[in-house]
């Protein structure tokens, strides 16, 4: 996740002011200080407030690491019995319209709107389609299909990048 944060910064046109090792140590220290048995960790980086406007290339780069107690995105019951998904009217953007491989706050808006709409209609999450109309992911979960032979199939990830998918695709568990 830390390497992805660094790469996302580069994709968005800035370098983080800390090394990979410094960020990982800060993450371990922050998680340890909170003492949660299960936690959600979100490192964030953003441009400073020295300039206001579309071009803010001369601003400082800030970094924070937030930690929340978070046992699971879905309840144990939902995880055992499955969740109800509503196909979102919003789609993951075309890679040529947004920096889709960057973990960028602006891209969360699509999932936030989709999740809210699904919940208003009695669903646990939204099924996100890519810009071509193919299944991409849920707003808070990856989508994997297992065929009769036990082969795992994942969506084509050209409009999003997910660490869990990369781990699975590389043979990790």
Where are these regions (language model features)?
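Ordered, amphipathic secondary-structure segments that act as subunit-interaction surfaces
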Residues: 16, 36-42
């Amino acid at each position: 996740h830390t390497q992805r944060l660094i790469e996302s910064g580069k994709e968005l046109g800035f370098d983080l002011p800390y090394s990979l090792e410094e960020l990982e140590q800060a993450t371990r220290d922050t998680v340890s200080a909170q003492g949660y048995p299960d936690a959600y960790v979100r490192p964030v980086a953003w441009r400073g407030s020295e300039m206001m406007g579309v071009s803010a290339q001369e601003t400082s780069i800030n970094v924070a690491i937030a930690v929340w107690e978070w046992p699971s995105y879905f309840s144990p019951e939902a995880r055992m019995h499955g969740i109800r998904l509503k196909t979102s009217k919003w789609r993951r953007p075309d890679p040529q319209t947004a920096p889709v491989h960057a973990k960028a706050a602006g891209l969360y808006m699509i999932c936030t709107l989709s999740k809210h709409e699904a919940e208003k209609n009695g669903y646990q999450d939204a099924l996100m389609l890519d810009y071509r109309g193919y299944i991409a992911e849920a707003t808070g979960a990856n989508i994997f299909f297992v065929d009769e032979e036990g082969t795992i199939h994942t969506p084509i990830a050209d409009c999003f990048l997910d660490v869990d998918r990369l781990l699975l695709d590389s043979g990790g568990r």
